[in-house]
A protein has these predicted regions:
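Short hydrophobic alpha-helical segments enriched in small aliphatic residues
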Residues: 6-9, 29-30, 42-48
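Short linear proline/tyrosine/threonine-rich motifs used for host-factor recruitment
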Residues: 35-37
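C-terminal, non-catalytic "cap/extension" segments appended to globular domains
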Residues: 54-57, 62-72, 94, 104, ...
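Contiguous, non-catalytic segments that form substrate-binding/exosite surfaces or channel walls
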Residues: 172-322, 519, 546
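Active-site recognition of the HExxH zinc-binding catalytic motif
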Residues: 327-340, 361-365
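Post-HExxH zinc-binding segment in Zn-dependent metallohydrolases
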Residues: 353-393
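A well-structured
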Residues: 54-229, 558-570
Length: 570
């Protein structure tokens, strides 16, 4: 997951905009001068004074009449640097704190983020700032492409905060910090009752914030659009119905097949320190800029960092599961590549991060699945693994690695799920969130419904809450609406791969070589470089030559797993 963009979505985005105040008398004098008014009691003077006394709307109109687009552009550029400074501070606290701070620092960290949020929200939502952005929007034909994008993004960010009381927003930030600490305790002790009250409070706060933003819209629709602009329940219901229609019977066919891949070659105990050495080599093979990269350890893998020149990845390593850290690193490094690949000229602006969580997950899932789980990449990957575990893996072949990593096995843990059953894990969370946000259930009902859905979709019994509803960190951060982007991002990736091959790339040969530069260059020029300047729909259309189509994803899954399991449709 990408913690950096989550902070931006949740805080929207802890932006700081300096107040722009122009004394009304100065404005009056300027207009009077333009109208060649010399006497104080002329009719024109009375007209100007009345305009100033009427309304904020008229003030905005006068600002537009007075403004010089060049002056406003200069103000925007200056303000964007201030936005960046506050964003940098907030992301550094929010990204690194959970990874490196001692436990007792949580309350202080939460208070710091809450106070930053209060100050930033107040300045971002100042009417004068809105007036500046409105003027620039009205004059957008005079702006270059970059400034137009900045104005679009800042107006969107402002609209998500302007009607939310500052106290409500700051209480939410404080609560997420507390809830995250409690979640970790609850997970480690397998005690849902510890976390349940925090979850109920987070749900109620989120609903209250959504009500303040737009009472006419369903809260979950608003949250879904926050994480992937333009989406809602109708969009995702259609998406998941298409996926479920293919995946559910395909899983059943794979499980019934006589051809069953074995995981035994990758079983055993693997030294954790050597796993971290392997992780560092994965950073190299994926082509990250190590001068702009930091690797840490955490309970739940995530990517964060304050800027293009400083991206952090946090992962975990388990002695009994060597593939867990391998694929977590491939995934999180996909997020990191996206952040590092953003146009360097976007530094110090609101464009200097990924455009959405769906797009971000498409990058992480692409390197985890379409590259990392491909048969072609199994050769360079097993060579890398043999380097660090020669005694254990020297006799393991690339095909054995590919087979073990792609074995379809309905399971409990989302992050350890195989590629085929993974979207069902996401579907379960999507349905759970709908029930929570609609009020159909409360936190006390979650474990039972969770177990029911895992039995329904995956046929497994949930033995503990640690392996059930406490396994993911997202709800403790208040990230309702994030989960569906994992499945959507996975689906985006199939369309990228199709487009790469259609343009003449020998995708398998690139993966087999271990030199992923052609893939990085393709994604970099079509996706990464744009930052937030373009939305997902624009990026997919530009990269693939057509709008998003879920059928590329369902066909990819059908073809791949039919071949692995020897099914008739292969």
């Amino acid at each position: 997951m990408c913690r950096k963009d989550v902070l931006i979505v949740l805080g929207r985005s802890l932006f700081s905009i300096a107040q722009i105040t122009i004394n009304n008398r100065v404005k009056y004098d300027a207009i009077a001068k333009r109208l060649h008014i010399t006497g104080k009691h002329t009719g024109h003077t009375y007209f100007v004074e009345r305009i100033f006394m009427d309304s904020a709307h008229n003030t905005v109109e006068l600002n537009a009449a007075l403004s010089n687009p060049r002056d406003d552009i200069a103000k925007l550029d200056e303000l964007e640097k201030k936005l960046f400074a506050f964003n940098y501070a907030a992301n550094e606290i929010g990204s690194f704190g959970p990874c490196i701070d001692p436990k007792k620092a949580a309350e202080e960290r939460g208070e710091a983020l809450a106070i930053l949020g209060e100050q930033i929200q107040e300045t971002l939502c100042d009417p004068a700032v809105g007036a500046l952005l409105d003027r620039l929007h009205e004059n957008r034909a005079l702006l270059d492409e970059t400034h137009r994008a900045q104005v679009k993004i800042l107006r969107r960010d402002r609209s998500q905060l302007v009607d939310v009381p500052v106290e409500l927003q700051s209480n939410f930030v404080r609560l997420t910090t507390e809830a995250n600490e409690v979640w970790e305790q609850a997970k480690n002790s397998d005690d849902w009752s510890l976390f349940a009250p925090k979850l109920d409070s987070l749900i109620e706060l989120r609903k209250e914030m959504c009500q303040a933003r737009d009472a006419s819209k369903d809260p979950y629709d608003l949250l879904l659009s926050d994480f992937e602009h333009g989406t809602n329940r109708e969009f995702y219901n259609t998406f998941f119905n298409n996926v479920k229609e293919v995946v559910v019977p395909l899983v059943a066919d794979c499980m019934a097949s006589k051809r069953q891949p074995s995981t035994k070659p990758l079983e055993g105990k693997f030294d954790v320190n050597r796993q971290w050495d392997l992780a560092k080599d994965l950073v190299k093979i994926q082509g990250l800029d190590e001068d702009a990269y930091w690797l840490g350890k955490t309970e739940h893998p995530y990517t964060g960092g304050p800027g293009i020149g400083f991206v952090m990845v946090a992962s975990h390593a388990y002695e009994n599961n060597v593939l867990s850290n391998v694929y977590s690193m491939l995934h999180e490094n996909g997020h990191a590549l996206y952040e590092q690949g953003i146009n360097w000229e976007y530094r110090f602006t609101s464009l200097s991060t990924g455009t959405s969580m769906g797009m971000h997950e498409s990058q992480s899932r692409f390197f985890e699945n379409y590259v990392g789980l491909s048969e072609a990449f199994a050769e360079p990957l097993i060579q890398l693994m043999r380097k660090h575990f020669p005694g254990q893996l020297n006799r393991v072949t690339a095909f054995q690695l590919f087979s073990a990593a792609n074995k379809v096995q309905p399971s409990l843990i989302r992050t350890e799920a195989d590629e085929l059953t993974y979207p069902l894990h996401i579907l379960i969370r999507y349905e759970m969130e709908q029930a929570l946000l609609s009020g159909e259930i409360t936190a006390k009902d979650v474990p039972a419904l969770w177990a029911e859905k895992y039995k329904q979709y995956l046929g497994v019994t949930v033995p503990t809450n640690t392996e059930g509803a406490l396994q993911d960190v997202h709800w403790s951060w208040g990230e309702f609406g994030y989960f569906p982007t994992y499945a959507l991002g996975s689906a985006y990736g199939a369309q990228y791969k199709h487009a790469m091959i259609a343009e003449g790339m020998d995708f398998d040969a690139v993966c087999a070589s271990g030199d992923l530069a052609p893939i990085r260059e393709w994604l970099g020029s079509r996706i990464w470089t744009w930052g937030r300047a373009k939305d997902s729909k624009e990026l997919i259309l530009g990269a693939c030559g057509e709008p998003f189509d879920v059928h590329y994803y369902t066909k990819y899954l059908t073809d791949k797993y039919s071949r692995i399991y020897g099914l008739a449709s292969a």
